[in-house]
């Protein structure tokens, strides 16, 4: 029997971001919901047929979503808070969008659900909110409709779901006690999943995949019991359906024995990010009779070609224990671009080293064929020989100057003088800012006009001089507007930047860039990460010209805006031939040069965004420092350690949970940190208070990822919440992220309310 191939999930936005465009058109009133549904159906059909044509045996369905799979699961379970139900939309899709984005209109005014990073990826999920009054029941036919839709096209699929354990661990539940065994919530959720399996049994599904990535995290007391309680109630309902328990982003060595003996028909193991531990667990505990191990050998989170020899070795190690091995993607392919087809800007000799989602289907099929081949067939395999050739030679020459510079670093290069308390006093005197200074995070709306002008430059339809004049006019206008509404510290708007990572990559040695390699970040928001191809260094100043120009146009303090080394790496496709630590150190030196040039140009506040610092923190706490923080935090200090005491260093962090690493963040030795907090209900404030956080802080006072405009009173209330926990002298007032993706009609009223709220609070404090 041939080795089975399985894909955990496929990108849903479309090869040319068709889903993004049609949904955003719907939000703007340019097309109706029927057009959205039609485009979605076309994309699903295309993606299923692609996988079928590639020879994939177990093709995913229900991996499609208009916004987010966790949100879909909440709706499936009827976990819809009353505030959204009261909007009384006719279409469930509109309820979904209100939960994701908030809503402000004739039907009411509600904020969006909280949004967090999906484990260690740059994908964001909506956090389900289970109210005490929630009536858990099967509330959607989406999974069954899409299964039948595929079947009508002649494609047999494997429905995919977020598993109940992961859902409950990530959701906001009424109280921790609700997760005790035999409580109503656990039983109700299990009953819905049991009903889902029973329905798929009636529909004739061969396999159903339940994703339980939360199993790769450290276990808290009661976690294993919760898992057992759920699946004890769910699995008896499966009938003839085979259930694949799929895990990814790490290992499940600490629960493998339990999972193995539980009666699952398949267990999916990540052999990229949990390789050694997962293999050791299988070797130690074996594989239960009737259980197939799905070997996750295809990396679903990077774009480099798979090393077939390595993958075959992993499969062979499993086959020493069991003959029942399938080959699979290590995670959903949601996290990689669609296809390398059309990437003509990258030389063919370089492009051959990359595999996007479509190419990974081919890799999966070739690995399966090689798994079944005899040793003689492997020796004569053209596919194996061509693959091995990619790894035999030197892909790119090392830069000796970069290595030499790193070799000369000393401990002193990672320490800024004098101590922060002394710097704060000097900076307050030098900057002369009021109490509760107001600012923004950096970017302002990138209008159609701005994007069109950039496209013209790219196509050669305007000269660089004309483009620069246009950018200067945009900067002039945004400075005037910031001055008019009364912001204290200004920014130049970043109109010259297409993306906070790609822009820097384009001005550094060692990067490659794609034309269409988009991946979903959240909802319709897509990003196009650059590729770290070789050693990194700065060729020329990157931001100095525009920052200096902006400062020359105002008497206010102008922030210089940079992206930090950890974030550049985490939001790029990193190399796999050298460590992340080494790549980050190279980036840190390049950005350090930029910091010093900005300071020399008269920029008094320099913001070094580390939006993605928390994102790649290992999922198990025992790995946090040795495998990440011990080099990530020093890399940030290396960037700014040489500036003058009076130069104020800011940083910014995005959707992350900071509470557990708050002391490490303080150790970055920035002078000010702003961070997204509005969707997290400012829970980080307690951690800041308890840790006696020394860095000045700007917790975001409103959510920029929602189109709704916060009232002045709403922001005032937020400020008072902040002042309950943080010394007023250390508080900054700002939105929770950059404003690039918002419209001007939302941005300026929101900022006017922000400034008015800050002034009102100041006035009360002065009395």
Curated annotation (Swiss-Prot):
L-homocysteine binds at residues 441-443, 494, 609. Gene3D superfamilies: 3.20.20.210. InterPro entries: Cbl-indep_Met_Synth_N, Cobalamin-indep_Met_synthase, Met_Synth_C/arc, UROD/MetE-like_sf. Keywords: Amino-acid biosynthesis, Metal-binding, Methionine biosynthesis, Methyltransferase, Repeat, Transferase, Zinc. Pfam families: Meth_synt_1, Meth_synt_2. Zn(2+) binds at residues 652, 654, 676, 737. Pathway: Amino-acid biosynthesis; L-methionine biosynthesis via de novo pathway; L-methionine from L-homocysteine (MetE route): step 1/1. The active site is at 705 (proton donor). GO terms for biological process: methionine biosynthetic process; methylation. PANTHER family: 5-METHYLTETRAHYDROPTEROYLTRIGLUTAMATE--HOMOCYSTEINE METHYLTRANSFERASE. Catalyzes the transfer of a methyl group from 5-methyltetrahydrofolate to homocysteine resulting in methionine formation. This is 5-methyltetrahydropteroyltriglutamate--homocysteine methyltransferase. The gene is metE.
